[in-house]
Amino acid sequence: MISLVYSPEYAKHHTGTHPENQRRLESIMNYLQEEGELEKLDIQEPVPASSEDILRVHTPHHLNYLKSFSEKGGGYLDFDTFASPQSYEIARLAAGGAIKASELVLNQDYDFAYSLARPPGHHATGNRAMGFCLINNLAVALEYVRKRYGLKKFIIFDFDAHYGNGTAEIFYHDPQILYISIHQDPHTIFPGEGFIEEMGSGEGKGFNLNIPMPPGSKTSDYIYILEKILETAYTEFKADFSFLDVGFDGHMEDPLSSLHLDDNFYPWIGCHLQKLTPKMVLVLEGGYCYDAMARSNLKMIKVLRDKITNEDRWQAQGELKVKDEIKRIFKKIQDTFSPYFTF
């Protein structure tokens, strides 16, 4: 079973014509309704994350500043991250959505729970909002689960087009958390981080695994490299709990990346991950082409809901030839991580 954690209150994070605006979630929910799928899904309401929950990840200064900034009317926190008068409260609700999704998987008969929330979170560091993100929703949920349930090892897979620098920074020294991110080459896209060499530090070295993909990478390129990495990583790391950071901005129709994924990637990754982890919490991040996001989201939800694990049906037709550059990237990852994983 799969549950969606969603609230219309997320629309109160008013951002005007900013790319990260309320139409993102509206397009998803409207499409689910139009396709007759909404009534087939269990929709759960989130509750705001407590200050205690958030402060396991973020500094008091960060939380107080967000609150004060919003209450004073909001505006741009940096060159591209916007907050409105209600954004602080809605960001707490978004973090609470990720916690609620985690609770559903841990306490009820749900294999998958999907926090369909905004603002997104994976660029938010412990002390800074950035990249459209105010509070790191997934990190807050993970630390909640670690504290409440005593689970020790976690795996996070992030396929947003942009590297989740905030999530990576928060857990960079932690050997109990494996963060895997596949994203567009950081030479060519925000935030300019996420190179293979950024592999964790101290005891956490070897547990921050970046897969930087060149602009123009297609579904077949992603499938080639993920088939070589994910199964080994999930099998050898042996996590107690799994999170998935969901980003639709790698789609070929998305205006904020130069990747060329098609609709088939999203059901494919849903099929593939089901074979690697029996339960999983999904947390929405990016995606800025409303139509592509709505279509791809539904396809991914369907394979999770219906327990479809036949990946072959989603293999991109006529794209069997993988660029040599992709093979070189895998070889570099294989060599760099050889002390940690047997890719």
Predicted features along the sequence, with ranges:
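Basic, low-complexity intrinsically disordered segments
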Residues: 20-21, 61, 241
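A general "terminal functional-core" signal
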Residues: 3-5, 10-13, 64-343
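Residue-level detector of secondary-structure boundary/capping sites
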Residues: 19-23, 45, 57, 89, ...
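N-terminal, well-ordered alpha-helical segments
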Residues: 26, 30, 52, 56, ...
